[in-house]
Amino acid sequence: MDESKKNERLQQLTDIQYNVTQKAGTERPFQNEFYDNVAKGIYVDIVSGKPLFSSNDQYDAGCGWPSFTKPIDEAEVIEHRDLTHGMIRTEVKSADADSHLGHVFPDGPQDKGGLRYCINSAALRFIPVDKLEEEGYQAYKKIFE
């Protein structure tokens, strides 16, 4: 992502969006926008706009954050070892904007690969199916057909 475009987008973020995506913060569980979203659509990086996750792969993990079994395109997420807070975890960042998204854990549904991408709502923007074309994401409509 072009640095000037990224800086412009960063200035438009709310405090929580900035803290989560740029400082690897974490929003509160069960008190965020998408933890219980059941609408069909895709989730894009709040900074770059790149598609990251589909509601088809979202499930209720009971953790209080949106959880997914996989990204739309694995090339759009990068994983890093995270040793903060006295834990060993795998951080998930967006490939294009280097936004902190959340973490991935090996305790997801076994029949869907066994992974749980636990993602902060503040790192995402949701595009409902009926707005995909209008928002420039028409190529992703096929996911829901």
From Swiss-Prot:
Active site, renumbered: C118
GO cellular component terms listed in the entry, alphabetical order: cytoplasm
Catalytic activity: L-methionyl-[protein] + [thioredoxin]-disulfide + H2O = L-methionyl-(R)-S-oxide-[protein] + [thioredoxin]-dithiol
Family: Belongs to the MsrB Met sulfoxide reductase family.
Enzyme Commission number: 1.8.4.12
Main EC class the enzyme belongs to: oxidoreductase
One Pfam family, short name: SelR
GO aspect biological process, one term: protein repair
InterPro entries, per database record: Met_Sox_Rdtase_MsrB (IPR028427), Met_Sox_Rdtase_MsrB_dom (IPR002579), Mss4-like_sf (IPR011057)
Annotated protein name in UniProt: Peptide methionine sulfoxide reductase MsrB
GO MF, one annotated term: peptide-methionine (R)-S-oxide reductase activity
UniProt KW keywords: Oxidoreductase
Coiled coil start-end: none
Domain MsrB, first and last residues per copy: 6-129
Gene: msrB
